[in-house]
A protein has these predicted regions:
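Phosphate-handling catalytic cores of nucleic-acid transaction enzymes
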Residues: 1-463
Length: 463
């Protein structure tokens, strides 16, 4: 154990960060130190800081590196992330801080564009020799916060490395998903996540745009009371919610401000170190194809141990899915976990490289292990959100029946309990069971048998 690792462990214990349940130790030691300083001196939640940084790292890496999953399947590291919490928990500030180096990078791109535009306009005005061959400069952007579908395609076409969508209130983005007629935003966001190409071939365009391998990150915030809107059937049934990593801290307490003279100095130093890491990731470039010399993404393969761990984990999921008899009982969200884990592993490998703590020749077992833990954390967050949404949406009589039943029960027991305790008919009890299943509070184990859905914090039905 080196000095930095020891220091991080001491600081984590001193600040009780282990109690948060967030697996901070999966990140590089240098990054852990930065996150701890931001949490302590910026009064932020460790969950929000770390996952915002993961999103920013993905935006910087873009399409330059991809991870090989199996056969012809490889993927970039694009993530859809939502930071959930009550008002005043400080969701937006750490997101802005994590993306500050990205904004600075964009400012440099803007300054370069303005300089080149001045040269172009001057050449055109004086009609210098060769000015007709001079291409008009194009402004490259990395982040978007308000856009149309056409604008998204155009901006990504101008910056094939990748685009990051930042929305302070994520439902503001999703509210636009119904206004595009035959080509809705929601369907595009689904296909983008899956790696399907983007194109804009409207007649009014001087030149059609096509992005063969889109890399679009999405990160935003929302309040806990609005999760009910996000878990509506429109987003659940389409599979959009399956593609989202949910970040929801266990503790709802707002951190106290610390009256320390050097807090701003410590936070500024942490921000500078983070900017250095993002700068190194931005410095990574495409590979060159041997036959055409065109830019091609670098493909990283898992080493033997990483491959064994990843495939073993996924095959256990497959075994559990294959054991389910009723198609309606299959949890569609699980089917996206392999993509989430692969993408997070690629990011952790790149971050460890940028921190000088590993290589970037392959994906090692540490990155896979870290990705599995982060995916599990985000899934627990999602399940806890689903628990309180289910409590709100399920009617009181259905919940009362559930409180009276054991963790596992059969139809006969439910009917008897309903008749003896609630004085309702068999048909009414079956309607209650349908309501409980619809709300996600119970699942069908097999025909005639049901189980209560348990969440990380206990049963979804706890009071």
């Amino acid at each position: 154990m080196d000095a930095l690792e020891l220091c991080n462990k001491i600081n984590m214990e001193a600040e009780s960060l282990a109690d948060s349940g967030f697996p901070l130790e999966v990140f590089p030691q240098k990054m852990q130190s930065i996150i701890i300083d931001m949490v302590v001196h910026g009064n932020f939640k460790v969950d929000y800081v770390a996952m915002s940084m993961l999103s920013a790292a993905s935006a910087a890496l873009g399409n330059t590196y991809r991870i090989h999953v199996k056969q012809d399947w490889d993927t970039n590291a694009a993530l859809y992330i939502i930071l959930v919490g009550r008002p005043g928990m400080g969701k937006t500030p750490p997101l802005q801080l994590a993306y500050k180096p990205i904004r600075e990078y964009e400012r440099k791109l803007f300054d370069k564009f303005c300089y080149e535009l001045d040269l172009y306009e001057a050449a055109c005005a004086t009609k210098e020799s060769g000015s007709k061959e001079m291409k008009k400069p194009i402004l490259k952007r990395v982040t978007l916060d308000d856009f149309t579908l056409e604008a998204l395609v155009l901006e990504h076409y101008n910056n094939l490395r990748g685009i990051a969508i930042n929305y302070d209130e994520i439902l503001g983005l999703l509210a636009n998903t119904d206004r595009y007629g035959k080509n809705p935003m929601l369907e595009r966001l689904l296909s983008i996540w899956s790696g399907c190409h983007l194109e804009n071939t409207r007649v009014k365009n001087d030149r059609p745009q096509r992005v063969e391998e889109p890399c679009v990150n999405i990160i935003g915030t929302t309040q806990t009371k609005r999760m009910k809107e996000l878990m509506a059937s429109k987003f659940m049934d389409t599979g959009f919610l399956d593609r989202i990593l949910v970040v929801y801290p266990k503790s709802k307490k707002v951190p106290h401000w610390l009256d320390e003279e050097d807090s701003h100095v410590r936070q500024s130093e942490a921000s500078r170190k983070w900017a250095d890491i993002i700068g190194k990731i931005f410095g990574l470039d495409y590979a060159r194809c041997n036959d055409t010399n065109e830019c091609c993404p670098n493909i990283l393969y898992m080493d033997k141990d990483a491959h064994s761990l990843f495939f073993g984990w996924w095959n256990r999921n497959v075994d559990a899915i294959n054991a389910i008899e009723d198609d309606e009982d299959v949890e569609t969200r699980v089917m996206k976990h392999n993509t989430h884990v692969a993408r997070i592993a690629l990011l952790l490998q790149a971050l460890r490289y940028a921190c000088g703590e590993s290589h970037l020749q392959s994906i090692d077992v540490d990155s896979i292990e870290g990705a599995l833990r982060l995916n599990e954390y985000c899934e627990n967050c999602y399940q806890r959100c689903r628990a309180f949404v289910a409590e709100d949406t399920c009617d009181s009589m259905s919940k009362e029946l559930l409180y009276l039943l054991e963790d596992s029960f059969d139809t006969k027991t439910a009917l008897k309990t309903g008749m003896e305790n609630l004085h309702v008919t068999d048909r009414t009890v079956m309607n209650y069971i349908k309501e409980l299943m619809k709300s996600g509070l119970i699942t069908k184990a097999k025909k005639g048998f049901y189980e209560k859905v348990k969440f990380e914090t206990g049963q979804a039905t706890e009071t």
